[in-house]
Amino acid sequence: MQAIIMAAGRGSRLGNLTDTIPKAFLTAKEHRLIDYNLSLLHENGIDDIKIVTGYKAGLYEDLAKEHAGITCIYNPFYAHCNVLGSFYMAQNELRDEDTVYLHADTLCDPAIFEEMVQGTGDIVMPVDFKTCDKEAMKVITEAGQVVKVSKEIPEMEAEGEFIGMAKLSAKAMPAIKAATRKLMREGCLNSYFEGAIQAVIDEGGYRVPTLSTEKRFWGEVDFEEDYRYVKDNLPDALWQIAERHKND
């Protein structure tokens, strides 16, 4: 199993907190956000890790020198495209095998992560079933399967928020790559990665089960209030895993 971490963006909505570092280098309880994600991957036996970089890429390259199994892939167009563009830059480096997809600035309870990695389905999507705001990556489901994922879903129709990490099966990977290439050829530079997921769902023939977060911790650091939430609520179990793997 391999992993791809999306880490190209600057995080400008965090103000001067990201003037000199990418947001995944912000710390919570002594460890950087990126360290927590790397430790979760190692804890689950995943050591082949690709990080798509952009803003302050040199810091990630230095990080890769300190850890075996990490490869950095630079997206020179990170300031002019969204996440799908970064995935496009990296997809030729990804084998068609089970893959964990995640964002460098998103953390979750270790139990959610483990359940996702062990989950069965072609695209296993952790979802926080709750009332969503306009900016949330919202989902609609049928019989436990995601049928629509988009920020454009009306808030009143949404069942919950996709937390931005997923397990992609070996079967789904070629379809995800093909959908990404198609969207890029169509000039969809501002598309989210979920646009490729939706294309695969629409194609049919793939199981896309949800994994409920069940009110367990997760957090995406986009704004200063998000950062405060993560620092105040980060689970001890996640910190302990980071401690255990800090020298990997």
Model-derived features: where do they sit?
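Conserved N-terminal catalytic core of the sugar/cofactor nucleotidyltransferase
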Residues: 2-5, 31-98, 186
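Conserved beta-loop-beta/alpha segment of the NTase-like Rossmann-fold superfamily
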Residues: 61, 66-137, 141
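Conserved alpha/beta core of the MobA/IspD/sugar-nucleotide pyrophosphorylase nucleotidyltransferase superfamily
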Residues: 1-3, 161-248
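A structural signal for short hydrophobic beta-strand segments in well-ordered beta-sheet cores
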Residues: 25, 139-141, 210
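Short catalytic helix/loop segments, enriched in acidic residues and glycine
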Residues: 20-35
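Conserved beta-strand segments of alpha/beta enzyme cores
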Residues: 24, 69-71, 207-209
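Conserved core of the sugar-phosphate nucleotidyltransferase
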Residues: 109-184
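N-terminal nucleotide-binding beta1-loop-alpha1 segment
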Residues: 1-19, 245-246
